Amino acid sequence: MAESEQKNEHSVGSEGASEAGDPSAQAKAAVDATTADAQAVDAGETTPAPADSAAEGTKREVEPVPVDEPQSFPVTVIIRRYDPEVDDEPRWVDYDVQMFSTERILDALHRIKWEQDPSLAFRRSCAHGVCGSDAMRINGKNRLACKALVKDFDVSKPIYVEAIKGLPLEKDLIVDMEPFFDSFREIQPFLQATGKPEKERHQTIAQRERFDDTTKCILCAACTTSCPVFWTDGQYFGPAAIVNAHRFIFDSRDEAAQVRLDILNDREGVWRCRTTFNCTDACPRGIQVTKAIAEVKQAMMTGVKL
């Protein structure tokens, strides 16, 4: 009897050992365990935990929170139109466009031109406030259309758009920029130094900072065409030309500072400035234009670079 029990125990132990080392037996046990868990869940006895490993699957993704879609709204844009082939004088034309708060006045002009009136004429290029080609007068203030956000205006009232003042009007929002660039070229806006250097011309941080502000000019003409002196006297050099002269007058590498000071020491030069700060307010690059003009005046009187 004892011998029989020992044989049975040996048999059971052998079967257990066989199952522990048998892969098919392990797989069967895993399936049985999964089935048991599923039955427990169906019976409401437990809640399954999310799988954490690659073998068991990935965690359940969290549903995204719904976001309200941005809503458009109507905006009335009134543009001062002028076609030299048809009009004797400029005229105001109303346009209603659907806009979003994050859009810009340039987007409104595009929408009008592409969807309502393809004859509308205006300049634009980069649309990122770098080229300076889309300067215009918006609600009585010179701005770049690509930087004027709709949300910054009271859209319960019309937005008025017209060409910048003081330069010859060609069509709609386009003016003749040649008088502006003539003044710019006259102040010799380029580095002038004698001889070829043996190595690059170095500057200290302080020397660079001396004229850093005026290097930001993008020649958009917003400052010059906001100047009341320029409106009444188109021969005045204007703020933009003086700003670009400042950029080289105070450059330690340049040797023609006095040449530019002599050019600006003219009845149409810096002394025509009346310090109204219109130019500083209009500059889309944040240049302290009035300050730069004052520094050129002081350099002209003292004969030295500040």
Feature annotation, model-predicted:
Residues 72-94:
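Eukaryote-biased recognition of intrinsically disordered, low-complexity regulatory segments
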Residues 80, 98, 137-140:
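Short strand-turn-strand beta-turns centered on an Asx-Gly dipeptide
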Residues 126-135:
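Short, structured protein-protein interaction patches enriched in aromatics and acidic/basic residues
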Residues 102-118, 157, 162-306:
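Ferredoxin-type iron-sulfur electron-transfer modules in oxidoreductases and energy-metabolism complexes
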